[in-house]
Amino acid sequence: HLIDNIRKNYNVPEYLVSKEASVQSVADNANQYGFWKSDATDSNQKTWIGIPLWVHRRCLKPMFTIANQIAYNNKMVLPSNITKVGKTGWYDVKGNAVQKQFVKEHGEKVVGLLADDWIEAIKEGKNEPSSFVISPFSAVQQQIKRMLKQRLPARIDIQRSKVNQWIDKSIGTVHTFQGKEAQKVYFVIGTDNTQDGAVNWSCEKPNLLNVAVTRAKKEFYVIGDMQRIQSKPFYETIFKERNVK
């Protein structure tokens, strides 16, 4: 890996430069105040969490509650002045994967939801909706982008170039959205019942789901096979905390 080779050449520690490193993890390691968090799947592994993360201001509950449970051992606190409650739900959509982990039915669901978001945003006098579509898998986000560019402009009667520009910045993999936020996030798991290994990869550690959930300020929705995935690590917390059924 190119980054790893550069890191080794300059004798930079792995915790500062790696695929797993983020601005947040570097900031945590630079902070002398904090606590050691045990890994949810391996109690022998611990991660240093810096004290600024103890107070969380981006997300409403239940997103805050989900992140707190899966990634922070319930150590985070929400400021007392944040009393509103957001929405978390799970759209139970099944189908067969047609392009790696991409399920056409998931894409069709996203088209309908985003068409509604655009119509609502325009009614409210906004230029565009504050919505992200995030997936663990590159193939899923690529195919959803393609489907949206084909179908969404006609659904909402907006100039195609404007819609395409919005699609390019609002749909992507989890890693491309680190540090960003939106009012609403749709998390598209993808995969069918022959690809359980791919789903298991997405929840090996809480990091990926934690980033996805905490992009959403007010609303977070999972799109995927509920029966197959709801009991898997960390997904079970999202399923349990959903308040839109």
Provide a role label for each language-model segment.
Residues 1-245:
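Conserved helicase motor core of SF1/SF2 NTP-dependent helicases
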